[in-house]
Amino acid sequence: MSSPILNTDDNNCVRVALRVRPLSKKEEAERSMEVVKYVDGEPQVIMGDNNQTFTFDYVFNGKSRQQEIFDDCVANLVDCLFEGYNSTILAYGQTGSGKTFTMGTTSTIGIPTEELGVIPRVIDFIYDKIDRKKDTHQLVLKVSFLELYNEEIRDMLNPYPTAGGLPIREKSNGEVYIPGLVEQIVRSRQQMEEALIRGSQSRTTGSTLMNSHSSRSHAIFSIIVEQTPINSPVTSSSTSSTSTSSSSDDKKQSKGKKKKKSSSPDSLSPNKDDDSSIMIDEDEEDDEEDEDDDIMSMDERNPSIRSMFHFVDLAGSERVKKTKAEGQRLKEGININGGLLALGNVISALGDTRRATTKPKHIPYRDSKLTRMLQSSLGGNSKTLMIACVSPADSNFEETLNTLKYAYRARNIMNKPVVNIDPVTQQILTYKTQIQTLKELLEKCTCRDIGDINSILASIPTVSIPPAPPLSTPTLTNNNNNNSSSNNNNNSNNNKLNVGGNNSGFSRTPSSSSLPPTNSSKSSIVKMNNSRNISSSSSSSSSSSSSSSLTTTPSITNNTATPSPTSVIVTNLSKEKEKEIFDLGMKVSQLEFENNMLQDISNKITSKYKALANRSRQLEEISQNFINNFSPNKDQTYFNELFEQFNSVLNQPTISPITPMMAAVSTQISSSNVIINSNSLLPMAEDNLLPGGKLESINNNNNNNNNSSEGIELFENDSEELSDLNQYISEKEEELELISKTKQQYQQMKEQFDQKVKELQSQLEEVTVEKDQALKELDKDKDKDKDNKDKDQYYEDEKLRLTQHYEKKLNELKQQLDQHAGSNKKDYQRLLDLKRKSEEKIDSLQQDIKDTKRQKSDLLKKMRDELKKRDDAKQTQAKELDALKREARKTEVIIDQLKNQSKKKDLLLQKKTDESESYKKKLKEIEVHKQRVIQPINSKSIPSNNNNNNSSGSVKSSNGSTASSASSANSSSSSSSSSSTNTSTTSTSATNNTTTSTSTSTPTTEQLNRKLLHRKSINVPYWREWLIHQIQKNLEKNELTELLQREFKNKEIFVRQANDLKKAFTSVPSKLSKSEYNEQSQFLETNIKLQNEKILKSQKDLTIISNDCLDSPEILRMVSNTSFDKLPKLIQSSIELCIEYAEINRKNQQIKFINVPTPPTLQSQQQHQKSQHFYIQPPQPLQSQQQQQEKQQKQSNSEQVLEQRSSTSDLLEGIKLAISESNNKNNINNNNNNVNIAKSQPILPSQQQLSSSQELAEEYTSPSTSSLGMKLDQLLDEIKLDKEKREKNKLLNGYPPMSGINYFNPPTPQPLSASSFLTSAAATTTTTTTTTTTTNKQQVPKSFAPLNNTNNNNNNNNSSPLLLISDDKLDHSVFDKDLLDVDILGNDSSNNGFSVININSNNNITIKKPPSSPTRPHRKTTSLQSSPLSLSLESGLATALANNGNNNNNSNNNDVFTRLASQPRPDSRLKKYRDKLNTDDYLMAIKRNMNREDENFMRCNWTFNGHDGGLLTLVLDEQNPSTLYSGGSDKNIKLWDLHTGDNMLDLSSPGPVRSLCINGSSGCMFSGGAERTVKVWDIRSPGNTNLCIFKTPSDVNCLVTYGNYVVSGLENGTFKVWDIRHMQKPLKTPLTTTPHHTGTIFSMSVTSKYLVTGSRDHTINLFHRDSFVLAQKLQPPHHDGVTSIAVLDDVIYSGSRDRTIKRWDVSSINNLINNNGENNSNNLITTQLAQQTVPILSNTPSNSNLIINNNNNIINNNNNNNNSSNNNKSSSAPSSTTSSLSSSLDNSTFSLLNQYQQNRLLNNAHNDWVNCLCIHNGMIFSGGKDSNIKGWDPLLSSNSLLLGHESSISCLTSSKEFLFSGSTDKCIKIWKC
């Protein structure tokens, strides 16, 4: 037996199984989506939108069962447990992912069998295997259960646990154990299950928001198996005698099997002596013993094994923000996450693939107790399975992704499992092996049988042996202890190397046979090849050790007794052994030579293999290219070229790798007399060729290369470019080398030149020195001969000669030097230039080389990236192709199913058709038979039943036949219908009972008679009632169908919003927080449930009604079954019914909007302040009018108001019909009837109203003509001059003139009939108050003429019709900038908030309307969408009011022009009032007004100072009115507490804050400014945290929010729009994609329908609120930038830098008739009105007195006091003018609806720019650059001036009680009445 085996196969990797649980009920309720996708047929999953793919060993979806997981993953681990390996199952995942359910660590009581986890199934499986192995093994089972709670180890099976937990210890071999842990012995599966239940009940659990039964600790349940074969030794000591006897018994049993080895190849070697034959026999015996070892059972090799199975149920990771854990739960979660973090670090370190190639990395096992306990399971002695449990819900996306990453990384962990043998048993096996080895050695050396040896050994007295092994060689002991038991079985015939000497054969050396078989022959050869010295030394030491071990026994015996025969034998053998050792040394050297030879062969084979692999790859590339590019349309040349490529590759000369190897081997063997068995050569060559299994890796690489051959073909261009770069680099390097050589040549030339120069200079110096020396010698000689004068001359001559000589020589040298320098100067300069150029060239070449190499590296990187992309694309395409194939297969299956269904339906249809034909035939027979039976009955039954008929009146004799025929028809119809309904029944009975005759299926005579009597009792219009019933049912069905469709659409909207919300939440990064997502999803889910309930209810109702309704085929069938004589009656009833329905529909449309109630009382008016009305009533004193109103109001309570249609044409018809009916009633009853026309409109929230005394209306009349005087003429002259100037300015500025009418010479007005007036008045509405009369009685139709015709203006006759018109529908008129800026309203309060039109007997009409005062809230008016045809003029209307003389008792205060002359407003644009704004007296008056005790006057109550710069914007939180937000140029946003006046918080901004807005629904505030950003602040949080920042292309000037949208106006004239629900990116809308303004956006506001924008380009644009489509551009524009916009009740007010304020409203046409004005002054007003005549009416005939003012009012200006010429023109006017005007108005009304027009212009509203506008309590407040604040009434007719700030007013805002203003003087002021 041997030591434990190290398993090195692929199964040692940690196996990972992924289990995805199904969605929980909570997740389904939250409508969570599954984010985990599966790959069919592959253990892969795909996560998220990025399609991240993870591959595991096993993948189980939510539908997998527990049994599947056990069979696929766990069963093989149980088998490994009984083989002696440790096993571990590790459950990993987040909390609530199903780990405990999968492992089964909970109690098994009450759990169904199919839901049992892994542990209960393992227990059953273990005991099943124990039942099978109990006969051969002795098994002991133990269990332990522990938990790790808060880093404390607890024993779950110990009833008295240790305080503080159990420690962790480590053995010397690195194994971790826990001392004190209870290992309970279990003897049955019930005991083991009880231990599991008891431990699971003691485990710590808790409840969190994510899991109600969350495990709060890590649990490890362990099963320990100790198995011992029954026949194996279990004791730790045995005597040598028992060992030898057992060995001899084994040997004797094995000798019976030696015969089959007699023909071994070893016997073929020559054997010449006995020794050789003995050696062969011994070799045969060794082979047989090896075979015995091979067949030795596992039980005998592993006698005592202890293995463990660990089940680890980890606590799930959790996030505090999801679990909302606190206190102890929070501490538990922190400890759990800490342990799992350490586990993740261990997995990451072990799973790092670089550990195999780099330095081993530290594994942080000691960071946590959990990792220390799992040390053996992760990277140690265990076979481990990790079950990763995840949740598929998108809400757990991040946790699922992290779990998959760790699990995927765990697959790279390599374990080292070994068979766990008991160490005592292992030592015994070692001793047995040594004893057996010694016996074999003695048997070979002594040539004796094993029995003789045993007897000799038995006769030797035993001596105590020390515990050390018998063999003293440490190598032998180490080999025996370290090598595995399987090495004994690896010896085979194919691995034997037989070497023969000269005289004797050599099978196996004694030394090698004496060694234990530690390795197979393959590995031994390789080892000897690599380390021959070690082999030699080991063999020699082993032989010497064996000899020394053999000599120990004789030494013992010699000391105790005389020499025995055994000692003699041993002595002789020792000499032989010495000789054999020498022979072994020779053999070792010979094996070394063979090893070298085989290594050379291996190298050659490797090279040949590479060549063949290259050729194979080329062939596969060519074939793959042929497959990819194959097309039947290819030319023959293409195929020829392809075959040539094949032939060229195949014809390359190659040599078989086996042939040269065999040849070389045979050559070497023949030369060295060594014979190698060919059968053993091939595996040896394979091992030597590619050690370590590299052959398989090369094959794999070849496969990969084949798979990537397509990618290589795609990179041909890049390869060519790469080769060009390489060539370019080589060329540049050669050029650089050449230039470097040139530089060296230049250096050499320079050195030669310098050397030459130096030589010449040295020569010159030498000559000079020689000259000086010669002259010195001559002077010395001359000094010696001073006295000899004869020699003086000689010396002089000699000196001259020497001087000349040396001078000549010096000159020659200098000439040579100059010549050398001059000749080489050009060359030198040229060399210098060449040097400089070469250096530059070198630098450039080096730079080019660097650039080229960089390009090369970039290209290589690009090629790698492209290759990777293409591989990914191929994988994706392959997956898509597989998916498409699967879809195609599914589609084919569906098509086949549909075909089968179609065939079945065709067969069924054919069958039904045949049955129908048979039924028709039977029906015809029944009809014929019925007619035969009915005819004799009719003559008897009809007269006898005339008295019982239920019709209105008895049947006359004259038409008795008709009644009879009708009854007969009814009877036949009923019979046919009844027979048709019972057709199936009768036919079935006929087919089932063939004996029944045909007469049995038809009704009897008594039945027919009874049915006929029943039909005669029904009224004649039976078909009519039936048709009405069917029509009603079908109408109800259609209504329910439409309702159902609407509910479905609403549900689709909510579902779409829920999907968008879920995408926004699951996107990375998430756009919504969890709380926001839960809140919005809960709201959408509630709506969806509500819609489902509505849909279910509608479907039930529709089903009930559908059962009663007959469809078209059924109706046609009933009609076809009706007799011919009944058809005329049916057709007549149908046509009459259609006509009646059409007539009823027409009348309903006409009277749909008609109601005749009396006016409501004053109290009801106060309760319904959202609408105002016009009354048309006869003129009477005020007291009588009020009494009449009270009388009418009492009668109005019992009337019902009908709904009015929104269409203008329907409104005209309704008013005409109402007035005509009213006049007809006056003619009959001579009573006063009132017509009230009220349009039901959506009610908008109104302004706060004052007391009822302030709501009394005033009746306006013009003053007497004598009060006007010269002031009127002066005013008109000034208007005329001003108008001419403005017309010139308009022409210069590009504006066309208003109309082509001569303004001061208008045509003569044409009188307008009352019908035309009423038609036009009903078609339009107005908000201005006018009074006009008409006197042309001949033009009034008879239906409008009163019964009592009088001409007295004071007539109190109540017979005149009263028309009540809702003031909600009246629209304000349009003001042009050229009109007079005056107040035209008086202050009379004679009416109760109603506009009254009085019609007297002379058809004099007076219209009265209450004014609006700046001191009271403005009444909310909702304008009717009407046509902007005519331009209104309030001043002209005031002149028309002045012509009415009915209200002479009014004071002069109602005179507009008198008030204009007496009390001019300070902001009038008349020059004589402009200078008052700058006078000191005026300012003093304002200051005095500040202190007066008037409740309606605004005062400054508080001032805030805190900004370091000017105020730019203010905003008030509507949800929290006590908080004010301010932004300024100091880059701060300040929060002010309005209760205390304190600055609560400062919010910093990157730039000046120009605009603020608050969205109440989301609780967010948006700020914009000069840094091209929009910040979002959460004002609901305590610190107003900044949520996000949006980038904008330009600075933000203004912000506005409504609904879910936020709109920002930018400085570049564009807009940005965000949806609050998805604020990641701005929306792309028509507003943002198309430029609508050319200048900066200064201001924005919102109406009920439109988004209003004002810009620097002087324009105002209207966009639809939801679609952001341009609706209208307001004309005419301002003359400078629009700085501010305010909206009051959908009326738009705009302020501009041109110091004006404009009022814009929906335009309308109001036709007012005035027949009584005859004043010259009114002619002037008429002239002024004519100036503003609408261009569309410019073609009015010249004799028409019809004038349209700027309030869209048509005034027929013919008064009773006109001159005779005007009367003549009026009397001669044709009536065709009125009809043409009416038709033109009607036609133009529909084309110009919903258009905003300017109806008020306020020039010089301020002395400087109008910076801001604000609405407060129904008034308009404006702030200007002149530091003033002004308050205006809604009509901009009067104002109140507030002394504002010390500097420019920059912003205004308001609440219900206060007005807030901000200025550039850094102050905020609060104003209150």
Swiss-Prot record:
Provide the residue positions that the database annotates as binding ATP: G93, Q94, T95, G96, S97, G98, K99, T100
Region (Disordered) spans which residues?
231-302, 463-567, 778-797, 841-891, 930-1008, 1179-1207, 1244-1267, 1328-1360, 1403-1467, 1758-1780
Gene for this chain = kif8
Q: Where is the composition biased (Low complexity)?
A: 232-247, 473-567, 937-1005, 1182-1200, 1244-1254, 1348-1358, 1423-1454
Keywords attached to this Swiss-Prot or TrEMBL record, sorted alphabetically, are: ATP-binding, Cell cycle, Cell division, Coiled coil, Cytoplasm, Cytoskeleton, Microtubule, Mitosis, Motor protein, Nucleotide-binding, Repeat, Transport, WD repeat
Any idea what job this protein has? Microtubule-associated force-producing protein that plays a role in organelle transport. Its motor activity is directed toward the microtubule's plus end. Cooperates with kif10 and dynein to organize interphase microtubules.
Question: Which residue stretches does the UniProt record annotate as biased composition, category Acidic residues?
Answer: 280-297
Which GO BP terms sit in this record? cell division; cytoplasmic microtubule organization; microtubule cytoskeleton organization; microtubule-based movement
Q: Which residues form a coiled coil?
A: 715-933
Q: Which organism is it from?
A: Dictyostelium discoideum
Cellular component GO terms, alphabetically?
cytoplasm; kinesin complex; microtubule
Name of the protein this chain belongs to: Kinesin-related protein 8
The UniProt entry's sequence similarity note says:
Belongs to the TRAFAC class myosin-kinesin ATPase superfamily. Kinesin family.
Residues of the Kinesin motor domain: 13-413
Provide the protein's localization: Cytoplasm, Cytoskeleton
Where is the major localization of this protein?
cytoplasm
Annotated GO MF terms: ATP binding; ATP hydrolysis activity; microtubule binding; microtubule motor activity
Q: What induces it?
A: Constitutively expressed.
Repeat (WD) residue spans along the chain: 1506-1546, 1548-1587, 1589-1628, 1636-1673, 1677-1714, 1805-1842, 1844-1873
Pfam families the record matches? Kinesin (PF00225), WD40 (PF00400)
